[in-house]
């Protein structure tokens, strides 16, 4: 099928197919087990005695014609749309809360504000940094949900938020802390020769007294 023609294996009905399931037009197109785009349409052209297929085996749901839409073409729209769904995000750097009450049910978001100072040489350049949470006295999976990734600050933006979810519990315990490390800046730098920035957040216990 198409994957065999271009030398790319993925997930799908056959060993060289990019679709999750047969006839999955509009679904995810996968390469190396990762979503690489959207399968806009697929088809198997045939007529009379001609059934064009790369190997003549029934190992795919499509033949040699396919069209994929790259997800990355809409990455800015995806990122910015998701950010609008953040619950109660801070409207300014001064409004960022450095402490968060853990509560007893569900999760509560806490935010980190990443600010771009100065100016872009090219206004169309995307600035990015990598980020990763790190345990302090708070433990990932127990007190907060670990997160890592790449944060992009798009043209006409001067900041972006990283959201981390705090896990509720009803255990009396001391206040706890965890960290967010920001590193590997692209199209910008931290200044003064710095290679990493770190911020801390405190999870405030609301479950009674703790003696330790």
Please place each PLM-identified region on the residue numbering.
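C-terminal subregion of chymotrypsin/trypsin-like serine protease catalytic domains
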Residues: 2-14, 18-90
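Short boundary segments that mark the start of a structured unit
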Residues: 87-212
């Amino acid at each position: 099928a198409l994957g065999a023609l271009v030398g790319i294996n993925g997930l799908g009905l056959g060993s060289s197919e990019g679709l999750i399931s047969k006839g999955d037009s509009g679904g995810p197109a996968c390469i190396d087990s990762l979503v690489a785009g959207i399968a806009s349409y697929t088809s198997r052209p045939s007529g009379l005695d001609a059934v064009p297929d790369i190997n003549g085996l029934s190992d795919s749901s499509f033949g040699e014609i396919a069209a994929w839409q790259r997800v990355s073409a809409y990455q800015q729209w995806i990122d910015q749309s998701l950010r609008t769904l953040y619950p109660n995000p801070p409207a300014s750097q001064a409004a960022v809360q450095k402490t968060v009450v853990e509560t007893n049910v569900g999760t509560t978001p806490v935010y980190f504000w990443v600010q771009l100072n100065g100016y872009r040489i090219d206004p169309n350049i995307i600035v990015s940094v990598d980020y990763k949470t790190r345990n302090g006295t708070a433990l990932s999976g127990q007190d907060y949900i670990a997160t890592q990734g790449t944060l992009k600050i798009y043209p006409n933006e001067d900041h972006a938020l990283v959201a981390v979810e705090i896990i509720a519990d009803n255990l009396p315990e001391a206040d706890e802390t965890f960290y967010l490390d920001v590193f590997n800046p692209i199209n910008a730098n931290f200044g003064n020769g710095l290679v990493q920035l770190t911020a801390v957040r405190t999870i405030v216990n609301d479950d009674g007294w703790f003696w330790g």
